[in-house]
Amino acid sequence: MATATPSGPRSSGRRSSMSTPLSPTRITRLQEKVDLQELNDRLALYIDTVRSLESENSLLHVQVTEREEVRSREVSGIKELYETELADARRSLDDTAREKARLQLELSKVSVEHQDLQASFSKRESELESTQARFRETEALLNSKNAALATAQSENKSLQGEVEDLKAEIGQLGSALALAKKQLEEEILMKVDLENRCQSLIEELNFRKNIYEEEIKETSRRHETRLVEVDSGRQVDYEYKLSQALSEMREQQESQIGLYKEELEQTYQSKLENARLASEMNSSAVNSTREELMESRIRIDSLTSQLSELQKESRAWHDRMQELEDMLAKEKDNSRKMLAEREREMADIRDQMQQQLNDYEQLLDVKLALDMEISAYRKLLEGEEERLKLSPSPSRVTVSRASSSRAVRTTKGKRKRIDVEESEASSSVSIDHSAAATGDVSIEEVDVDGKYIRLKNNSEKDHPLGGWELTRTIGEASVNFKFTSRYVLKAEQTVTIWAADAGVKASPPSDLIWKNQNSWGTGEDVKATLKNSQGEEVAQRTTIYTTNIPEEEFEEGEEIFEETAKEFHYPQQKSGNKNCAIM
């Protein structure tokens, strides 16, 4: 290694040269020596500069390496986060699309049910209107019957008043009849008394007549005795006078007796006639009263029968009206209950639709937020790529439907110096589904989120699944669902067994809820098997997740690091080789 020459000999040489003359050869050598010293000084300075530059270069290389590692980690983290969020966004969009399709189907079903309910409701309304019309007709008829009943009751009251009047009149006539009977009895007693008096008078008259005859006989006997004494001349005159006087007395007595008898007979006949007339009048009044009473009784009986018939008819109409009112109340209650139930169902459906709309809005908000974040990440990456002068290529997402797998690939541009080149096919995650069935029932679908498993009857006949067991295995963990003994899967129909936390209502026989299990479980390798009641496996379905990293990624990574190493290390090695050559 060249070193600097001390200044002492150089000054002494100069002094000696000044003191003694130098030859041209000496001057040339001295000049060459001075040039060599200057070259050595410049070389030493260059070596020091190269060493300092190498140390700075090594420090810069370390810093660049650290920054590149940090950058690569940040880019890989951002890329993974972006890819995971993008995959989650796509998954959520797929779930949203499936949920939207399912909700559209449910909405169509609900709309059909709503139309059916509206038709049944309109039918019930028409029936209710017809029932109300019949009720109004019945009510009008009942009102007419009530009016007729009121008129009949008023007539009955008037007839009862007449009956009371007739009863009062009958009482008066009865009292008059009793009075007439009493008078008749008194007249009869008076007649008997008068007859007795007449008989006693006749007997008294006969007795007096006998007494008179006896007196006459006694007088005649006396006169005879006197006549014996009287002369025969005056006897004839005396007898004539006596006979005349006797005849006069007899006529007077007979006339008096006749008058008295006639007077008695007239009095008796008049009283008897009066009594007979009074009796006839009383009997005619009683007969007329009896006839009127009979007519009144007949009329009362007819009115009573009519009243009873009207009351029976009124009770029948009242019962019918009560029955119709009960039927109408029941129909109203049923209609009200049906309307309340339908309104509650519509409210539930509206709540579900509102909840689904809210979920849609939340999903749309999440989607918009993800889109905004993705656009922000894209702008950030584009800004970094523009700042680092990269040539970016658009990302690409491929979905393989034929093999039932999904692959997410992103392409990245090639960077200079500290930028990292990423391959076009960086990574892929595939989901492979395989299914097999030995019978008519197959496992149609297994949800990757563990919400449901769907079975399908591929035959044209109903298939009983009583005692069948559905098992889902993830690694070493497994869950079992057993069908009830009476369950039958209809021909060409599907049945979906939902987990308890799937948020779906039970709708047998197409949708069943496993209340004891919140989720079917999620994982990378999923296997679902269906066994019959004898324990034989009749169907299975397997879902396998596969992550592939292509060889081009490693090769391109090696090329990236080789180019980076060339860019950073080769200039240093070249400078070192130059230094060594110079040395």
Swiss-Prot record:
Motif annotated as Nuclear localization signal, chain positions: 414-419
GO CC terms in record: intermediate filament; nuclear envelope; nuclear lamina; nuclear matrix; nucleoplasm
Stored SMART domains: Filament
Bias-annotated ranges (Low complexity): 1-23, 390-408, 425-436
Annotated site (Heptad change of phase): Y268, K332
UniProt GO BP: heterochromatin formation; nuclear envelope organization; nuclear migration; nuclear pore localization; protein localization to nuclear envelope
Repeat found in the keyword field: no
Molecular-function annotations in GO: structural constituent of cytoskeleton
Post-translational events: Phosphorylation plays a key role in lamin organization, subcellular localization and nuclear envelope disintegration. Phosphorylation by CDK1 at Ser-23 at the onset of mitosis drives lamin disassembly and nuclear envelope breakdown.
Segments for region (Coil 1B): 82-215
InterPro entries in the cross-refs: IF_conserved, IF_rod_dom, Lamin_tail_dom, Lamin_tail_dom_sf
Region of interest called Coil 2, as start-end residue ranges on this chain: 244-386
Location of region: Disordered: 1-25, 387-436
Coiled-coil regions listed: none
Keywords recorded for this protein, A-Z: Coiled coil, Intermediate filament, Lipoprotein, Methylation, Nucleus, Phosphoprotein, Prenylation
Region (Linker 1): 70-81
Protein name according to UniProt: Lamin-B1.S
Organism whose genome encodes this protein: Xenopus laevis
Chain's gene name: lmnb1.S
